[in-house]
Design a protein with these regions (language model features):
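Small-residue-rich helix-interface/hinge motifs
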Residues: 3-92, 311-330
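Transmembrane alpha-helix interface/packing and boundary motifs in multi-pass membrane proteins
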Residues: 262-266, 302-316
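Juxtamembrane boundary at the C-terminal end of a transmembrane helix
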Residues: 356-370
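Alpha-helical transmembrane segments of integral membrane proteins
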Residues: 6-9, 13, 300, 346-353
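PDZ peptide-recognition modules
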Residues: 4-5, 80-113, 117-120, 124-273, ...
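Hydrophobic alpha-helical segments of integral membrane proteins
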Residues: 39, 60, 64, 115-119, ...
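Small-residue-enriched transmembrane helix starts and helix-helix packing motifs
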Residues: 290-307
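Membrane interface segments of multi-pass transport proteins and intramembrane proteases
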Residues: 47-50, 148-152, 325-341
Length: 370
């Protein structure tokens, strides 16, 4: 039963995240007058298809993705779409449908329109993340966690080194705290159990350098930090819920960028990379705890996909936007041969990283270090 729940939850999350991403590309392409030849949910052989205003809407066998095939776009998706070179998908498109394909090819759209089309997928991932977090925060029984200290424990080291009841935590180690979890995340990253705080005290900003925290050791000899203070809860007014949801999107997005930066700086080990197997394992664990954990993981994954897709990497939407920025500045498109070579190399690198991350996942499963 647990395997079925994991499988169902994984399909739900991956399906929702990818479908909303592709819908973003689809909707903005339509708004910009670009011809959309196919909008597909799923991959592989066609199960159901219908036509409307020159666009084929398809449900395919494998619920592991989706795609949008745009006229004038050189991509595997366009090749799979009917009317391209995908010859195993059934009969040719009816002539009356082809006659309705009056939109312009993507490569003939204005540069700014192409940039909007490329960015729209990631934007919709952020929108989905916001909606999921909005529902999650609204439906939870607990109040919103604020950044204002309610009380500092007696003899707590953090109180002896600067923090006071009533302080509103603004930043930790120079990083602005949008939500309470920003503070906790930054404290987790510190290896010395001390940090520089910026707080708002009596209406003015106060710098508190070198705030230190108590520690304790478990039976395995591992050291843990004790926070030493509690914070106020916030009432769930509509404004507070909206602000917390928007700030939580920023929080999750920044975690992803910070993790990548830590990886490049050597602060995090490449052995910590996780791939599809690890994600499915995490989904299974979340599903065993309840819908709230699944929803929070859905929010994290969709925001993760949005952030990663905007990275200036040739195989990603962000890389395509960089090519378009170069075209906008110079007035000349980057030669297709150069774009193609960079994209192939980037895909090879990403595929290699995915294989390595999958290897890490399998090792963790076998050794029990999940």
């Amino acid at each position: 039963m647990s395997v079925f729940i994991t499988f169902a939850a994984a399909l739900l999350i991956f399906g929702a995240v990818i479908a909303i991403h592709e819908f973003g590309h689809f909707a903005v392409a339509k708004l910009c007058g670009v011809q959309v030849n196919e909008f597909s949910i799923g991959m592989g052989p066609t199960l159901i298809k219908t036509y409307r205003k020159g666009t084929q809407y398809t449900l395919r066998l494998l619920p592991v993705g989706g795609f949008v095939a745009l006229e004038g776009e050189e991509s595997p998706e366009s090749e799979q779409a009917e009317g391209g070179s995908g010859e195993d998908d059934g009969p040719d498109i009816p002539p009356e449908v082809l006659a309705q394909r009056t939109g312009k090819p993507l490569n003939e759209a204005a540069v700014w329109q192409r940039m909007l089309v490329m960015a729209a997928g990631a934007v919709m991932n952020f929108v989905l993340g916001f909606v999921v977090l909005l529902l999650l925060i609204s439906l939870r029984s607990e109040p919103i966690t604020s950044k204002v200290i309610y009380a500092v424990e007696d003899n707590a080291l953090c109180g002896q080194t600067g923090l006071q009841a009533g302080d509103e935590i603004v930043a930790v180690n120079g990083r602005h705290c949008f939500v309470a979890n920003d503070m906790l995340y930054e404290l987790m990253r510190t290896e010395s159990y001390r940090a520089d705080f910026t707080v708002r005290r009596d209406g003015r900003l106060v710098e508190l350098p070198d705030v230190r925290f108590d520690t304790w050791q478990d039976e395995q000899g591992q050291t843990h930090m004790t926070l030493g203070f509690t914070v106020y809860g916030l009432k769930k007014t509509p404004l507070n819920v909206l602000k917390e949801s928007a700030n939580s999107v920023i929080y999750y997005g920044r975690i992803i960028y910070t993790s990548l930066a830590d990886l490049l700086r050597g602060r995090e080990s490449i052995n910590d990379l996780s791939g599809p197997v690890g994600i499915v394992t995490a989904i299974g664990q979340a599903a065993s705890y309840g819908w709230e954990d699944v929803a929070e993981l859905l929010g994290l994954i969709t925001i993760n996909l949005g952030v990663l897709n905007l990275l200036p990497f040739p195989a990603l939407d962000g890389g395509k936007i960089v090519f378009l920025l170069i075209e906008a500045v110079t007035g000349h498109a980057v030669p297709e041969k150069i774009q193609g070579s960079l994209t192939v190399a980037a895909f090879a690198l990403l595929f290699g990283l995915m294989l390595f991350a999958t290897y890490n996942d399998i090792v963790r499963l076998v050794t029990g270090a999940v």
